[in-house]
From Swiss-Prot:
One of its GO terms (molecular function) is type 1 cannabinoid receptor binding. Interacts with the cannabinoid receptor CNR1 (via C-terminus). Does not interact with cannabinoid receptor CNR2. The gene is Cnrip1. This is CB1 cannabinoid receptor-interacting protein 1. It comes from the Eukaryota. GO terms for cellular component: cytoplasm; GABA-ergic synapse; glutamatergic synapse; plasma membrane; presynapse.
Amino acid sequence: MGDLPGIVRLSIALRIQPNDGPVFFKVDGQRFGQNRTIKLLTGSSYKVEVKIKPTTLQVENISIGGVLVPLELKCKEPDGERVVYTGIYDTEGVAPTKSGERQPIQITMPFTDIGTFETVWQVKFYNYHKRDHCQWGSPFSVIEYECKPNETRSLMWVNKESFL
């Protein structure tokens, strides 16, 4: 086991396929558990891009709402700052969220030797007939996290989450 990094910075980007289209969120205020809702379309594929700093960290998959997404190491960024992993998240078979409701979905990403990143996204899944609703709100490129691994190497504490 190597040294435990003081801070881990990671970003998670979602792009709807096949055209790498943007994913949107809306601000719901305090009506639900979280103030931001990510809008996703059922029966669709999303490219997941995870960027991690420091570059010595390794990850094999991310679980999004219980769907295991294998991640493939793509590259280091040209400046050598972060390592980039990609995978495909498929919403085939996911039930649309009922009107007026939101779904909390668990996100987990186990890292080799330093513990598991965990967070919860508030999501609304729309079916094909309401697909235009997925484009109402604000597009985001990435969700960035600043995390601190705990001493037992079991979990990482999320210090900061930013939608950019």
